[in-house]
A protein has these predicted regions:
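Aromatic "clamp/platform" in nucleotide-sugar-dependent glycosyltransferases that forms part
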Residues: 282
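Carbohydrate-associated surface elements
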Residues: 145, 166
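N-terminal strand-loop element at the rim of the active site
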Residues: 5-64, 149, 228-229
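A conserved mid-protein helix/loop that constitutes part of the nucleotide-sugar donor-binding site
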Residues: 13-21, 193, 197-216, 220, ...
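Conserved acidic donor-binding segment of nucleotide-sugar-dependent glycosyltransferases
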Residues: 314-327, 335-340
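Short hydrophobic beta-strand element within catalytic cores of glycosyltransferases
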Residues: 34, 299-303
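Short alpha-helical donor nucleotide-sugar binding micro-motif in glycosyltransferases
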Residues: 73, 252-253, 258-264, 269-274
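Nucleotide-activated donor-binding/catalytic signature segment of Leloir-type glycosyltransferases, i.e.
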Residues: 235-262
Length: 415
């Protein structure tokens, strides 16, 4: 089987990292097309043996990418096209139809209740997505929560397949030596209570809530792994609260990047060094960072984590949801500090979300989509789009999602 993956961009992020993990395991010949931003992950994927083509799309409304992508699909002649992220899903489905490929699978990696990929959902975004979704064979949701959101959008049940994200759990196993080494490097005593967080430092992740909560707990330190536009605002916030010496912003990959983003030892070592992990994001599609923390035997406080919330409580006894405010998080951290919970056994939820299992389930979706295409089933119902430029689907245009404000209506710089 030959599979062509089309993704919006390969900048460091959960979707791109997940794609790389899957490419190493899928029993198919795969190639990758990135519409924008190849970055170091493209080099890593190529180093793993998978070709990557960059189409140099200049913006959300760059319609010239459609005939170029369609021509590439004809030249590549894949059995299945698999699209990832909103822009690639919309353009990829249309280009596949233009090229005559009917086995098209799309994964929704970052669909929230009110945002998609960190941007606010609008009526236009929903309408275009729904119209082009009909051109595909299957839509993959990374959690039951995302599947429910797709159903509310009007995606038919028969086209929704839940294939959860997966991790390499062994990479995040607790390492006492790594704990001691990192604490010594940061000047932290063995008995210091240390909180941790990890992710892209952008407003929607709400790491400001985490920083403010820790500043209200004397003697508690925070290790925050990640990079992004909110790095300096968070640093200034810590200083304004007089806690700059207790808020340790480690940078991308926990300050210890490997040759490829996401491959370094920094985040696993950070997880070993802390006592509790916090994921403050209020609207998520899955919750990979929280799952990695559970693989390290940590107690996890989260604002939203469908990977855990969709399952019975006994699957992740160390995970607990908190209200989205600073007060609720501060109280939860204070209680954990008082009880000194210690390390936990790796919970069942971690074994459920194994990346090898994800690859097997995704392969089954490919086989089903390809079998349906080969049986020459009636084409999916046509999308109804207004009139547009010659040679392209009538009036095809991609609405630009509006930037999503922080949930309380203020950016970090306004605090």
């Amino acid at each position: 089987m030959k599979v062509l993956h089309v993704i919006t961009g390969l900048e460091v992020g959960g979707a791109a990292q997940q794609l790389r993990l899957l490419l190493r395991r899928l029993p198919a010949h795969c190639e990758v097309v990135t519409l924008t931003t190849p970055g170091p992950l493209a080099e890593a994927i190529e180093a793993d043996g998978t070709p990557v083509t960059h189409l140099e799309m200049t913006g959300n409304r760059d319609l010239s990418v459609l005939p170029r992508l369609s021509a590439l699909i004809r030249d590549t002649a894949p059995d299945v096209i698999h699209t990832h992220l909103y822009r690639a899903c919309v353009y990829g489905r249309v280009a596949a139809r233009m090229a005559g490929v009917r086995a098209v699978v799309a994964t929704e990696h970052s669909l929230g209740d009110a945002v998609i990929e960190g941007r606010r959902l609008t009526r236009g975004v929903r309408t275009l997505y729904r119209a082009t979704e009909r051109l595909g064979s299957a839509t993959v949701a990374v959690s039951d929560t995302v599947a429910a959101r797709l159903r509310r959008w009007g995606v038919p049940e028969r086209r929704i397949h839940v294939v959860p994200n997966g991790i390499e759990a062994h990479r995040f196993a607790y390492d006492p030596a790594a704990r001691a080494t990192l604490r010594a490097r940061l000047g932290l005593a063995p008995d210091t209570f240390v909180v941790g967080g990890a992710g892209r430092l952008v407003p929607g992740k709400r790491f400001d809530v985490l920083v403010r909560a820790v500043t209200q707990l004397p003697g508690v330190h925070l290790l925050l792994a990640g990079d992004g536009p909110e790095l300096e605002p968070l640093r200034r916030m810590a200083g304004q609260f007089g806690s700059g010496d207790r808020i340790h912003l480690l940078g991308a990959d926990g300050g210890e990047p490997g040759p490829v983003p996401g491959d370094g030892p920094g985040v696993p070592r950070m997880l070993s060094a802390i006592d509790v992990f916090v994921s403050p994001t209020p609207d998520q599609a899955f919750g990979l960072a929280a799952l990695e923390a559970l693989a390290s035997g940590l107690h996890v406080l989260h604002g939203s984590c469908p990977a855990v919330d969709d399952l019975p409580a006994d699957q992740a006894p160390g995970a607990r949801r908190f209200g989205h405010g600073v007060h609720e998080l501060t109280a939860a951290l204070r209680e954990l500090r008082r009880t000194e919970p210690g390390r936990l056994p790796v919970p069942p939820v971690v074994h459920r979300y194994d990346i090898d299992r994800s690859a097997r389930e995704l392969t089954a979706v490919y086989e089903q989509a390809l079998a349906a295409a080969r049986r020459n089933r009636p084409a999916p119902e046509p999308a109804t789009l207004p009139a547009g430029p010659p040679g392209l689907p009538p009036g095809f245009s991609l609405p630009d999602p509006s930037p999503a404000p922080a949930p309380d209506g203020h950016s970090l710089s306004q605090r």
